[in-house]
């Protein structure tokens, strides 16, 4: 792609004051897009972190940047994409002209892009390599019962599209807080293999703790050698010693270990648990696509 010397990309996301992993995927995708040199500038802004959405209005020099493409790194349309982001960035529609002459174009959220289906299939294959889809149930997990129900609708849409492909024995959209419940996966599925993919932008409390507890793997361990079980990443948190930064790194490793212990053997079946879909490197491609679509 040709470098647009007068155009910039702004990726906006929720962020978190308590979960440092919340902004990590957004920052990683921004770094990758910056490396590709498609835009003259690539920045990120957050609702709950710095730089803030409100400050993002001043990130780009109007003398150098004439057009800013804003891409919401959210899984679906909802309260934040429809209300918070436009309010904080002072946007009055899909296209906003600033008094300084800059044109700001606001795209649909990344979760609306057709490539989401492809990424979900890719992640399901990666987390369960060599496992036959015909003998596997794929569960796409969303929150359910939230400020806006669109995330549940988006999960249902993706499940329907993957189901129509006829690749997996069963494809279900399931939820943490409303039926069909992810905690009922044993009743909902009959296959020997089950793949669970959290339909979230980043990993955090839901993917590290809540969903594992709901599906019964928070205390389960796959068959692995004693040598591996003694690895730092799987030690109880109380065993960590050293500096605060080192402890934080260790805690991050311990949280991420839940994704590396596949498969979980439960009731004679194999359960494979994936990281949140928003951590997939392919999101950078979707962000670029959404930005280019917003510019057209």
Model-derived features: where do they sit?
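Active-site-proximal alpha-helix that buttresses catalytic centers in soluble enzyme cores
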Residues: 1-296
């Amino acid at each position: 792609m040709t470098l647009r010397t007068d155009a910039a990309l702004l990726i906006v996301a929720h962020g978190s004051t308590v979960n440092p992993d919340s902004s990590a995927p957004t920052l990683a995708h921004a770094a990758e897009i910056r490396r590709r040199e498609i835009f003259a500038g690539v920045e990120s802004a957050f609702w709950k972190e710095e730089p803030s959405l409100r400050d993002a209005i001043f990130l780009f020099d109007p003398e150098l940047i004439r057009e800013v493409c804003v891409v919401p790194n959210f899984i679906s349309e909802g309260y934040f994409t429809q209300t918070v982001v436009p309010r904080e960035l002072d946007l009055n529609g899909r296209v906003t002209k600033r008094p300084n002459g800059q044109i700001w174009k606001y795209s649909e959220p990344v979760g609306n892009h057709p490539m989401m289906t492809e990424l979900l299939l890719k992640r399901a294959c990666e987390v369960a390599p060599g496992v036959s889809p015909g003998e596997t149930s794929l569960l796409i997990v969303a929150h359910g019962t939230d400020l806006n129900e669109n995330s549940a609708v988006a999960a249902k849409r993706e499940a329907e599209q993957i189901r129509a492909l006829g690749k997996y024995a069963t494809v279900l959209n399931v939820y943490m807080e409303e039926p069909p419940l992810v905690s009922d996966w044993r009743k909902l599925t009959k296959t020997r293999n089950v793949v669970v993919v959290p339909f979230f932008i980043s990993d955090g409390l839901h993917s590290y703790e809540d969903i594992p507890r709901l599906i019964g793997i928070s205390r389960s361990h796959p068959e692995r050698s004693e040598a591996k079980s003694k690895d730092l990443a799987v030690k109880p948190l109380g065993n960590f010693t050293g500096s605060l930064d080192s402890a934080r790194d260790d805690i991050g490793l311990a949280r991420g270990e839940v994704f590396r212990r596949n498969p979980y053997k439960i009731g004679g079946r194999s359960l494979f648990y994936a990281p949140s879909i928003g951590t997939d490197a392919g999101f950078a491609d979707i962000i670029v696509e959404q930005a280019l679509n917003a510019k057209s």
